[in-house]
């Protein structure tokens, strides 16, 4: 247990005791408003100032003051949100305080992030996103594994758990009391729904505050995977049993530790270099392994006990689903993914004897969820629930070029997002729906038929729906007879799809 405890403490920054006084400085709220308008990240701005790794309250104050002077933010009378500042609203005061509180709390974490990146000699860290590691995992690793566990990030049984987790990092009692006030205030006003929804799905006006709390909560939940990954890296040829026996799952409840010690004495041999693979996006996680189903059940019990004993998180066993990859499909990042076994027969001949050899190759597939995607188009009035295109009267007042541009942009975004799909037939159906819906909208505007309008408009209408990927591939692969044929077979992952990750909410 001492080794795991040292691990949890090794990367933690120096305890900050002077966070609360910053709440009485007006430039903090100007800075918070600036971040709300620009959506920037604190450590990206900090890199431009060139501060060293001596984090102290004086440096933090100078940093904020300098940023405030460079970004003179004056809320004018013509501000579109000026009506929010009329009167004395309790919600307004709470919102303003929480925004400033979130900015202040991000400072020490951002300082620690920048310094750790400098030690590892990682440059331009603001261009890196954790989502970029998911695509290589899908392509290179998943097809060689046997089982996958779909995990929902556990939620705290009580809001006080969030305060206690943060207390282990920052020992500033006034700030923790203020954090406790914010959480209970939003709970009473039904803005915080931590029972059934993610903490990040909260009031948009306080999104920065809840994103900070949620990201820190997820970071603590995932700390066990980082620890085990490091142990696996250093102990590839040794048994995991000694590690688990020594840590006792970092349990703080005495009877639980006794139960685990007695229960796992006979099964510690099972945790031999498990080759566990873990990826997460938003509130969904995947834990894949090459082990057996019994092996995955042991890991499921381990995670449930660990989260409940160490973090007091309400993690029910039914929030972790174990399935075999070769006969189960799962939703992730808006894709319907699975691993198929493609069988093929090869005829071999040796002297006068010939025989057939059956081979089976695992292939990872990412499919486009047709029914949910058509349901989203039907909800937006592009088609009916059966996928039959309909006109969109709301666009009839716009110009022809604007209507065509809007429909074409929607399709290009969809084709860009699902360019990593192994089968793109669904994209052609979506293209048909959007093209015909656009044509019917224009025909309705000009009081004409669809056939006559398409004949009059000609090729410019078709070019608007040409995928950008097809144009690029025609330059990269000039020998390919048809760029659309090439794009149909190629799987291309674009790393900027997080900009349109709202598509993941439709499945």
From Swiss-Prot:
Report if keyword tRNA processing is assigned. Answer: yes
TM annotation in the entry: none
Subcellular locations according to the entry:
Plastid, Chloroplast
Task: Give the matching Pfam families.
Answer: Intron_maturas2 (PF01348), MatK_N (PF01824)
Q: Which keywords accompany this UniProt record? A: Chloroplast, mRNA processing, Plastid, RNA-binding, tRNA processing
Q: GO CC annotations? A: chloroplast
GO BP field: mRNA processing; RNA splicing; tRNA processing
| HAMAP family reported for this sequence | MatK
Which function does this protein serve? Usually encoded in the trnK tRNA gene intron. Probably assists in splicing its own and other chloroplast group II introns.
Family listed:
Belongs to the intron maturase 2 family. MatK subfamily.
Alphabetized PANTHER family for the sequence: MATURASE K (PTHR34811:SF1)
What name has this protein been given in UniProt? Maturase K
């Amino acid at each position: 247990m001492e080794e795991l405890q040292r691990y949890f403490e090794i990367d933690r920054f120096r305890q900050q005791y002077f966070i609360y006084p910053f709440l009485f400085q007006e430039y903090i709220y100007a800075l918070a408003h600036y971040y709300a308008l620009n959506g920037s990240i604190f450590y990206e701005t900090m890199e431009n100032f060139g501060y060293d790794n001596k984090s102290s309250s004086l440096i933090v104050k100078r940093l904020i003051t300098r940023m405030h002077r460079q970004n003179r933010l004056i809320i004018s009378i013509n501000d579109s949100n000026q009506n929010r500042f009329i009167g004395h609203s309790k919600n307004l005061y709470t919102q303003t305080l929480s925004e400033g509180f979130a900015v202040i709390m991000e400072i020490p974490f951002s300082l620690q992030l920048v310094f750790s990146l400098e030690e590892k000699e990682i440059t331009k860290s603001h261009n890196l996103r954790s989502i970029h590691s998911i695509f290589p995992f899908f392509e290179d690793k998943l097809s060689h594994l046997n089982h996958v566990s779909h995990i929902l990030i556990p939620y705290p049984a009580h809001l006080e758990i969030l305060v206690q987790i943060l207390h282990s990092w920052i020992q500033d009692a006034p700030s923790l009391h203020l954090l406790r006030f914010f959480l209970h205030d939003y709970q009473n006003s039904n803005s915080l729904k931590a029972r059934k929804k993610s903490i990040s799905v909260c009031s948009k006006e306080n999104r920065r505050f809840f994103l900070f709390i949620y990201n820190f909560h997820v970071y603590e939940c995932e700390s066990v995977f980082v620890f085990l990954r490091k142990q696996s890296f250093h102990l590839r040829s040794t048994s995991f049993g000694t590690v688990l026996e020594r840590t006792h799952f970092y349990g703080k409840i005495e009877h639980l530790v006794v139960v685990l010690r007695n229960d796992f004495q006979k099964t510690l041999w099972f945790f031999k270099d498990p080759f566990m693979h873990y990826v997460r996006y938003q509130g969904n996680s995947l834990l894949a392994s090459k082990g057996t189903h019994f092996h995955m059940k042991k890991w499921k019990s381990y995670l449930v006990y660990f989260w409940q004993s160490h973090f007091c998180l309400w993690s029910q066993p039914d929030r972790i689903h174990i399935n075999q990859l070769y006969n189960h499909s799962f939703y992730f990042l808006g894709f319907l993914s699975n691993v198929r076994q493609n069988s093929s027969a090869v005829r071999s001949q040796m002297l006068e004897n010939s025989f057939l050899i059956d081979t089976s190759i695992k292939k990872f597939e990412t499919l486009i969820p047709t029914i949910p995607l058509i349901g989203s188009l039907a909800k937006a009035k592009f088609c009916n629930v059966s996928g039959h295109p309909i006109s969109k009267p709301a666009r009839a007042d716009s110009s022809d070029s604007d209507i065509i541009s809007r429909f074409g942009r929607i399709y290009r975004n969809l084709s860009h997002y699902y360019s990593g799909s192994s089968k793109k037939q669904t994209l052609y159906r979506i293209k048909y729906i959007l093209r015909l819906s656009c044509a019917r909208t224009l025909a309705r505007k000009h009081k004409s038929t669809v056939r006559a309008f398409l004949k009059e408009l000609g090729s410019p209408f078709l070019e608007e729906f040409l995928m950008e990927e097809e144009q690029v591939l025609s330059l990269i692969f000039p020998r390919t007879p048809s760029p659309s044929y090439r794009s149909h077979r190629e799987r291309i992952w674009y790393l900027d799809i997080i900009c349109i990750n709202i598509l993941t909410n439709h499945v």
